Amino acid sequence: MKRITLLLPFLAAFLGIQAQQEAGSWSITPRVGINSSVLTMDDVYLDVNGTETMKAQHRWGLTAGVETQYQCWSQIALSAGLMYSNEGCQYDKKGDVDEWKQSLHFLSVPLLVNFYIEPDLLPGLSLKTGVQLGYLLQSKETLMGTTNTNTDSFHRVNVSIPAGISYEYRSIVADLRYNIGVTNLCSHKLMDETWRSNSLWLTLGYQFRL
């Protein structure tokens, strides 16, 4: 038992060396994962009296890209990336309302500050926040089995505020972040609505130290 107790500090130090980068170092991390997103669209009325409504539902999509990081100090790092994400929302079929799906294809640049909570006790665990600049590549809607491009109904630029947590073990990086939409994406002239895209990303990456 005493031997195990004596080995624990050395084990913790070993894991810390594997997970924590030195100040002044660079790394690049390709990552891939899934996201759950929704647009803040108005409710759909299910009857003419407007007594029953249906909210937009989350939809699942793919997230993939690459991020580079600079370790400023032991607890602070800055990162920038180029990420693709397929986001949107959907309304399920209910009553006289047909199923409708909205798909948005974004190319985004996340600019983040990463705060490593306690490098000695919790090596590799960090909180992150910053700003994300997105560009809408294409938008498609599916109604009654027919898919049409409706990119003109959306503004191209999407600004969001990401906040998340990540864990690095050796070269494996697990990341969970929530992107809060800031800009109104609705450009439809006949609609006085505010469409913001909120999404939760879960990705797994492999870190290459430069």
Give the location of each predicted region:
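Cleavable N-terminal export/targeting peptides
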Residues: M1-S25, R209-L210
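Short glycine/proline- and aromatic-enriched beta-strand/turn motifs that initiate or cap beta-hairpins
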Residues: Q20-G61
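Gram-negative (and chloroplast) outer-membrane scaffold detector with strong preference
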Residues: E22-I28, I34-T40, E67-K140, T203-L210
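Residues that define the transmembrane beta-barrel architecture of outer-membrane proteins
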Residues: G24-I28, H58-L62, S103-V109, P123, ...
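Outer-membrane beta-barrel proteins
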Residues: E52-A56, T68, E99-K101, T149-S153, ...
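Predominantly the C-terminal beta-signal and adjacent terminal strand-loop region
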Residues: G81-M83, E87, T151-L210
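A charged, solvent-exposed segment within the mature domains of Sec-exported extracytoplasmic proteins
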Residues: G124-S166
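Outer-membrane beta-barrel translocator domains and adjoining extracellular loop/strand segments
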Residues: T40-V48, Q90-V97, S139-T146, C186-M191
